[in-house]
Amino acid sequence: MEDFVRQCFNPIIVELAEKAMKEYGEDPKIETNKFAAICTHLEVCFMYSDFHFIDERGESIIVESGDPNALLKHRFEIIEGRDRTMAWTVVNSICNTTGVEKPKFLPDLYDYKENRFVEIGVTRREVHIYYLEKANKIKSEKTHIHIFSFTGEEMATKADYTLDEESRARIKTRLFTIRQEMASRGLWDSFRQSERGEETIEERFEITGTMRRLADQSLPPNFSSLENFRAYVDGFEPNGCIEGKLSQMSKEVNARIEPFLKTTPRPLRLPDGPPCFQRSKFLLMDALKLSIEDPSHEGEGIPLYDAIKCMKTFFGWKEPNIVKPHEKGINPNYLLAWKQVLAELQDIENEEKIPKTKNMKKTSQLKWALGENMAPEKVDFEDCKDVSDLKQYDSDEPEPRSLASWIQSEFNKACELTDSSWIELDEIGEDVAPIEHIASMRRNYFTAEVSHCRATEYIMKGVYINTALLNASCAAMDDFQLIPMISKCRTKEGRRKTNLYGFIIKGRSHLRNDTDVVNFVSMEFSLTDPRLEPHKWEKYCVLEIGDMLLRTAIGQVSRPMFLYVRTNGTSKIKMKWGMEMRRCLLQSLQQIESMIEAESSVKEKDMTKEFFENKSETWPIGESPEGVEEGSIGKVCRTLLAKSVFNSLYASPQLEGFSAESRKLLLIVQALRDNLEPGTFDLGGLYEAIEECLINDPWVLLNASWFNSFLTHALK
């Protein structure tokens, strides 16, 4: 039957049916008759609304393949097939705009011509019996009921069949075809009977032979036979005392359930050690941009041309010198690498025609920085499997690091507004259905709150760098290509702006597997003096490369300009995710949307406008040592976005583990706050699982410290 459903119905319908069943915890592979029934019902709903439109005069018309430009509105709004929250949002929206009474149950369609909700029924029994069942359940005069059967009969409220003969005949023909197809495969009897709750063939299904032996072998301990086990499962009451249940399941398990009280949880233990260091792939709050406004130079949009143009806006270059060496590196090589970039950019300018890409000369400093010829030689396993002391490298345990204040500052900066807009509003066509109107409205409000956010700049910067690096890694595998780090934005006045943050030089990149590493050297401009927080810059060699004149309230001041240089690496899979950083916008929008939905369901109307425009209302943003912080809805949008962006920038196994394990403790604490009297066993084990992820990652350590603030306030 499952195969039949997948062959017989449109894949979109099959997917919707699977979703609906999963929402109710049902398995399409097991409850195959139900699966078929849901698909049939969905298809009838879609066929009911197909080709039916309302023209400019408000008349109902049928258009099968007409002028796509005609101003037509769909006659029916389809409610069936949406997830519950969305379906109720559509229903509420229709009720608010039309004044129709709100139904108690989710109907299938709304008819804009007759201004009424429609309940569609498809039955394998007598139509009048099914009609009465529906009417009894709905108990509403306002909802129109229309029942179809597989035998070509139909029944509708007050014999008003809504649609023309031909449209209804199409539905009946399709139902008859489905029935014949089922019958030819021997599926119809089981399908027909399953609606009436008669005993079906499946229930008398006997397990014999090999299957029976396998079933007997795979019984849990202490069960003598399959019947014995079935009886036990049928009689198992899921509620009640957990200890009893566990001992009932197995003699080996003995869990003492401890009550979880306000005094039970302790704060997470953060590691001691030297302060943690910056490990993002590019500078965040410390980045400095060289920019051109309204770019219109020849070759505008070609990264190398743009970069040279940006470099020319700065006149304060000076002889570079090292101000903060890298502890382990050969620092003069970093200095030589920067000088080489300047020299090769100068060479390009002296050429007649500027090339579109630039491959650096393979100098000794670049070979060193990019780890050329440093990888151990790979030997075929066949050649060395007889070596007696073959073993894996001993790798050092990571050194524990303590939380440093810089990561909180980074996060605060990411939530702030910049004076430029980093995303454009997509051009999306006119809204047709009410749900699209709500969606566009939410998207526009959200975009307005986050388009100028620094986290959005990080998204666009990340997308650009990862795309450029992945492209170069595939297109110029053996070359040390010079890749400018560029972003584009618009100023307050709406002028276009191109920004250069620095350069990347990529190493050899024969990336066969997703996890194969490409090395790169990054060189990024900054005004931050590294000597203020040297621990943050452990992995960097920092040069002083110029002096920049800055306009301040007291006039022009000269500040030293630094170049942060480091060796780094990434992989195909990391670049793929980096290219998709725009997803962070979607994730935070969905979080905001669920807040709006919660408000709307309380008020029983769409609260989008009030939500964004009520400037006096504040919302909880997070917990700090001082207590729960609150802010405007815009601040909430930007904070959620920044969290999502940092999860991407600082993605790591430590973060995965911490998020998964700390969530369990969070749920227990929330249950305590809701007075649900939670109980736990092996709380120590849970703490261990959380704390083994707290090693040295700055973002994870910051999240752990936030978690501790949350614990303190939650348990007051």
Swiss-Prot record:
GO molecular function: endonuclease activity; metal ion binding; RNA binding
Keywords: Cap snatching, Endonuclease, Eukaryotic host gene expression shutoff by virus, Eukaryotic host transcription shutoff by virus, Host cytoplasm, Host gene expression shutoff by virus, Host nucleus, Host-virus interaction, Hydrolase, Inhibition of host RNA polymerase II by virus, Manganese, Metal-binding, Nuclease, Phosphoprotein
Short motif Nuclear localization signal 2 (NLS2), span: 184-247
Cofactor note: Binds 2 manganese ions per subunit.
Residues that, per the record, bind Mn(2+) 2: 80, 108
Subcellular location: Host cytoplasm; Host nucleus
E.C. number(s) listed in UniProt: 3.1.-.-
InterPro entries: INFV_PA, PA/PA-X, PA/PA-X_sf
Protein family: Belongs to the influenza viruses PA family.
Function: Plays an essential role in viral RNA transcription and replication by forming the heterotrimeric polymerase complex together with PB1 and PB2 subunits. The complex transcribes viral mRNAs by using a unique mechanism called cap-snatching. It consists in the hijacking and cleavage of host capped pre-mRNAs. These short capped RNAs are then used as primers for viral mRNAs. The PB2 subunit is responsible for the binding of the 5' cap of cellular pre-mRNAs which are subsequently cleaved after 10-13 nucleotides by the PA subunit that carries the endonuclease activity.
Protein name as it appears in the record: Polymerase acidic protein
